[in-house]
Amino acid sequence: MRGAAPTVADLNLELNDLVLPANLLSEEVLQSSDDEYEITEEESVVPFRIDTCCYRCEVAVRITLYAAELGLRTLEQLLVEGKLTFCCTACARSLNRNGR
């Protein structure tokens, strides 16, 4: 706007050059969704053990897995929210007829 008494004609509505497309700073690069789940050399896979109980019969269940940090955080979130539970091999056999 210019002048002591601004008017509608003084407004500059061409703001496209002032807006960053995705809040990228310091030459950051957007990754496609396919690249998000690839494990890079920098992101190492580590062993992780979970001791819990069966959802159905409450017998002790121990699971060892290998995952990257992002995978472990996602798993932890699912477990804490109750969206993921484990079952023992005996319950799995009786429920799923040996996986068939």
From Swiss-Prot:
Residue ranges, annotated region (E7 terminal domain): 1-42
Give the boundaries of each unnamed zinc finger. 54-91
Q: Which GO terms describe its cellular component?
A: host cell cytoplasm; host cell nucleus
Is Metal-binding a UniProt keyword of this protein?
Answer: yes
User: Coordinates of motif Nuclear export signal in the sequence?
Assistant: 72-80
**Modification after translation:** Highly phosphorylated.
Q: Provide the alphabetized UniProt keywords.
A: Activator, DNA-binding, Early protein, G1/S host cell cycle checkpoint dysregulation by virus, Host cytoplasm, Host nucleus, Host-virus interaction, Inhibition of host innate immune response by virus, Inhibition of host interferon signaling pathway by virus, Interferon antiviral system evasion, Metal-binding, Modulation of host cell cycle by virus, Oncogene, Transcription, Transcription regulation, Viral immunoevasion, Zinc, Zinc-finger
Compartment annotation: Host cytoplasm; Host nucleus
As for what it does, the entry says: Plays a role in viral genome replication by driving entry of quiescent cells into the cell cycle. Stimulation of progression from G1 to S phase allows the virus to efficiently use the cellular DNA replicating machinery to achieve viral genome replication. E7 protein has both transforming and trans-activating activities. Induces the disassembly of the E2F1 transcription factor from RB1, with subsequent transcriptional activation of E2F1-regulated S-phase genes. Interferes with host histone deacetylation mediated by HDAC1 and HDAC2, leading to transcription activation.
Written domain comment of the UniProt record: The E7 terminal domain is an intrinsically disordered domain, whose flexibility and conformational transitions confer target adaptability to the oncoprotein. It allows adaptation to a variety of protein targets and exposes the PEST degradation sequence that regulates its turnover in the cell.
How does the annotation summarize its subunit structure?
Answer: Homodimer. Homooligomer. Interacts with host RB1; this interaction induces dissociation of RB1-E2F1 complex thereby disrupting RB1 activity. Interacts with host EP300; this interaction represses EP300 transcriptional activity. Interacts with protein E2; this interaction inhibits E7 oncogenic activity. Interacts with host TMEM173/STING; this interaction impairs the ability of TMEM173/STING to sense cytosolic DNA and promote the production of type I interferon (IFN-alpha and IFN-beta).
**HAMAP family per record:** PPV_E7 (MF_04004)
What protein family is recorded?
Answer: Belongs to the papillomaviridae E7 protein family.
What is the protein's name according to its record? Protein E7
